[in-house]
């Protein structure tokens, strides 16, 4: 496992260097590629590194590298442009205003003395919420041409198929990838959380009756199910707007894989959300 972890670290460091280089050149599109190629596997990468090296400090460096990339991209956009940030003419949409209000509420609840959590912990919690706003902000100001968009769609399709195949393999062999990678021990050492449930992972990995829920290469079944909502939206859009019957058949098969993946992850909230997405898409 140490060989796999070493190769993974080398590839990741090289990829981060490439992404940061492109970001400093002013191309925020590569931040989106970073999200697509790393975040779905982020928790699994941490498990592999921990199992390979057994070093908590190394895992923490890896974990916070994501924050470094996002905040660096944000600062480059704010201060690295020839045109001053203040000189921009902002035309806010309803979604922009909702996001701005959401981030403002987060900032207020971080600063006011509410709750028992210490101020440092509140800042750490708020950081993850601010990352959502940063990604939205950068995406809002990134121009993506048709060629790049087609590549993004291909990556999303590969993630859909890949996650289904992983979950199907877990189902067939009656195991969890996280169990193979010692998720229980990782959670105990890194987060001081003891393993729970019938599979030595956490209760998130099973539903009522002790039946397993699978996460594929995502961190847990809930994250897997949430990602399926994005895959569902992509499949529905191209199914309804494709001009060719062969393409429609392919996207119909993709939606079938998404449906089966919902069964593997079994998140009732995500299943209800998928029904809402289908309803508003069709009507």
Which functions belong to the PLM regions below?
Residues 103-111, 134, 150-177, 188-266, ...:
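Alpha-helical transmembrane segments of multi-pass inner-membrane proteins
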Residues 6-17, 41-42, 59-80, 126-134, ...:
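Membrane-embedded alpha-helical segments of multi-pass membrane proteins
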Residues 24, 55-61, 91-94, 113-122, ...:
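Membrane-interfacial loop-to-transmembrane-helix junctions in polytopic alpha-helical membrane proteins
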Residues 20-30, 79-98, 235-253:
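Membrane-interface helix-loop-helix junctions at transmembrane boundaries of multi-pass membrane enzymes
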Residues 13-24, 37, 72-87, 109-172:
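Transmembrane alpha-helical segments and their membrane-water interfaces
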Residues 29-50, 55-133:
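N-terminal hydrophobic segments of proteins, predominantly signal-anchor/transmembrane helices
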Residues 3-14, 65, 101-104, 108, ...:
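Alpha-helical hydrophobic membrane-insertion segments
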Residues 1-31, 38-39:
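N-terminal alpha-helical transmembrane segments of multi-pass membrane transport
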């Amino acid at each position: 496992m140490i060989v796999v972890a070493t190769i993974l670290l080398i590839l990741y460091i090289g990829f981060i260097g490439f992404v940061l280089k492109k970001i400093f050149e002013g191309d925020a599109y590569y931040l989106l590629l970073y999200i697509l190629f790393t975040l779905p596997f982020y928790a699994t990468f941490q498990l592999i590194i921990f199992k390979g090296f057994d070093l908590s400090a190394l895992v923490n460096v890896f974990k916070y590298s994501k924050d470094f990339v996002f905040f660096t991209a944000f600062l480059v956009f704010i201060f690295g442009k020839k045109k001053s940030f203040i000189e921009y003419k902002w035309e806010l949409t309803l979604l922009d205003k909702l996001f701005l209000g959401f981030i403002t509420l987060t900032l207020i609840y971080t600063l006011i003395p509410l709750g028992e959590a210490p101020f440092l912990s509140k800042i750490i919690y708020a950081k993850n919420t601010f990352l959502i706003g940063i990604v939205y902000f950068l995406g809002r100001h990134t121009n993506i041409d048709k060629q790049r968009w087609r590549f993004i769609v291909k990556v999303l399709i590969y993630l859909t198929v890949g996650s289904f195949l992983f979950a199907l393999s877990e189902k067939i062999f009656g195991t969890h990838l996280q169990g193979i990678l010692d998720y229980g021990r990782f959670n105990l050492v890194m987060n001081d959380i003891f393993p729970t449930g019938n599979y030595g992972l956490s209760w998130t990995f099973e539903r009522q009756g002790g039946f397993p829920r699978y996460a594929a290469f995502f961190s847990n079944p809930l994250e897997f199910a949430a990602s399926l909502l994005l895959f569902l939206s992509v499949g529905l859009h191209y199914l309804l707007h494709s001009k060719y019957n062969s393409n429609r058949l392919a996207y119909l098969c993709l939606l079938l894989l998404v449906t089966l993946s919902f069964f593997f992850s079994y998140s009732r909230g995500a299943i209800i959300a998928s029904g809402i997405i289908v309803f508003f898409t069709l009507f």
